[in-house]
């Protein structure tokens, strides 16, 4: 029986990123305003929380876009601040709220469509 997107929901976006990390050489570095920065490969970097002030640095590092998977309810998420900072820096910013506790197949679909769209990579995902 073929799997549907709903059947794949337990295999979260985070799981996909871990699989990429396992197959690539992960480069970690300290970047002010970015927690746990790791460049997974030439087209993707992942991190934990960031500050709006780090967005200009993300653009300077050569990323074409920022994909934020955090829920607006998370402490320090500051979606509005990130959106404004990305607009000021001239870097596309995508907010795709994703809960690992209750994965939403629609969010997974949106992420996959976004990350594979022309001009999105290299992407900074957090």
Task: Locate the predicted segments by residue.
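Bacterial N-terminal signal peptides that target proteins for export
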Residues: 1-12
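Cys-dependent protein tyrosine phosphatase-like superfamily
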Residues: 16, 20-123
């Amino acid at each position: 029986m073929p799997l549907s997107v709903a059947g794949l929901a337990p295999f979260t976006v985070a799981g996909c990123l871990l699989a990429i990390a396992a197959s690539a050489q992960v480069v970690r570095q300290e970047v002010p305003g970015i927690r746990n920065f790791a460049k997974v490969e030439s087209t993707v970097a992942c991190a934990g929380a960031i500050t709006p002030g780090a967005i200009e640095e993300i653009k300077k590092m050569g990323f074409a876009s920022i994909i934020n998977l955090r829920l607006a309810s998370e402490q320090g998420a500051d979606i509005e601040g990130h959106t404004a900072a990305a607009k000021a820096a001239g870097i596309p910013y995508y907010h795709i709220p994703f809960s690992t506790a209750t994965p939403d197949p629609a969010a997974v679909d949106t992420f996959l469509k976004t990350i594979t769209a022309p001009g999105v990579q290299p992407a900074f995902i957090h």
